[in-house]
């Protein structure tokens, strides 16, 4: 099997081990195909190499249904890391907590949005007034305003188009920040930066596991996480987008 090797000399402890645990956990779901882990050590990981082809509508439709199956495999709790892994997980190069919580809102606000806000402010990418708006949105989320009866889903956690590879055998996922969360968060991240045949993906997902009414209105709520991550290190345009998403979240109630 041909392999793709990633190395990072300054990788924090557990950086690649967390990725490997996430890949294996997602693969166990039997939904979307995930790149297989071949080898892993403290400063490197080797995964199967995926020969990419042009995205196709048939593959997109299959991806939507398979993603629903992956989410349905579930997790022990909101915020739960893959079994066998303890400690922080990583999104890109940034660490984020993975502490199990009973409710989605308490987890999402405290572990997926709030940790990145002061970093964004210090970087000059988010104003103090903008941080106040985000803080109010997080308070609303933490109080349970958007909690529902959805069980914890098995999330990829960094589901943007760059981590969705199109092969001759269908979509293959790489580079997860896997954890237990709300399934709408994966879908919102997929929409944030665009993905080929997104509407077809969403359609077959919804057919396989119908989404709750109003899910499109909640996209900004579920984009708070990736926008906060990007505001922390990718410029003030993401800070402005984060504030806009926070304002839309506040307007939901």
Predicted segment positions?
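Active-site Asp-x-Gly
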Residues: 97-109, 118, 148-154, 161-217, ...
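A general structural signal marking secondary-structure boundaries and capping sites
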Residues: 27-30, 71-78, 120, 145, ...
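ATP-binding pocket architecture of kinase catalytic cores
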Residues: 2-106
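An alpha-helical support segment within catalytic cores of ATP-dependent transferases
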Residues: 75-154
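Regulatory N- and C-terminal appendages and interdomain linkers associated
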Residues: 11-17, 42-45, 79, 128, ...
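Conserved Rossmann-like nucleotide-binding pocket used by diverse enzymes
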Residues: 5, 155, 220
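Short strand-connecting beta-turns/loops that link adjacent beta-strands
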Residues: 42, 167-170, 224
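Hydrophobic alpha-helical segments that form the core
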Residues: 220-228
């Amino acid at each position: 099997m041909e392999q793709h090797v990633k190395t990072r000399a300054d990788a924090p402890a557990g950086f690649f081990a967390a990725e490997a645990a996430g890949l294996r956990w997602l693969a166990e779901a039997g939904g979307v195909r995930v790149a297989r882990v071949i080898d892993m050590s403290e400063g490197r990981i080797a995964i199967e190499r995926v020969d990419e082809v042009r995205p196709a509508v048939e593959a997109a439709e299959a991806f939507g249904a398979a993603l629903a199956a992956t989410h349905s495999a579930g997790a022990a709790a909101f915020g739960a890391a893959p079994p066998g892994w303890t400690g922080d997980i990583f999104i890109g190069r940034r660490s984020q907590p993975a502490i199990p919580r009973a409710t989605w809102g308490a987890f999402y606000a405290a572990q997926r949005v709030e940790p990145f806000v002061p970093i964004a402010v210090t970087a000059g990418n988010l104003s103090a007034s903008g941080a106040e708006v985000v803080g109010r949105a997080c308070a609303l989320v933490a109080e349970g305003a958007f909690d529902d009866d959805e069980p914890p889903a098995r999330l990829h956690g960094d589901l943007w188009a760059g981590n969705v590879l199109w092969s001759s055998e269908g979509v293959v996922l790489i580079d997860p920040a896997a954890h237990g969360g709300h399934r709408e968060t994966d879908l919102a991240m997929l929409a944030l930066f665009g993905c080929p045949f997104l509407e077809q993906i969403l359609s077959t997902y919804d057919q396989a596991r119908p989404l709750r009414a109003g899910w499109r209105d909640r996209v900004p709520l579920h984009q708070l996480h990736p926008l906060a991550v990007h505001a922390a290190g990718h410029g003030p345009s993401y800070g402005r987008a984060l504030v806009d998403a926070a304002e839309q979240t506040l307007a939901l109630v």
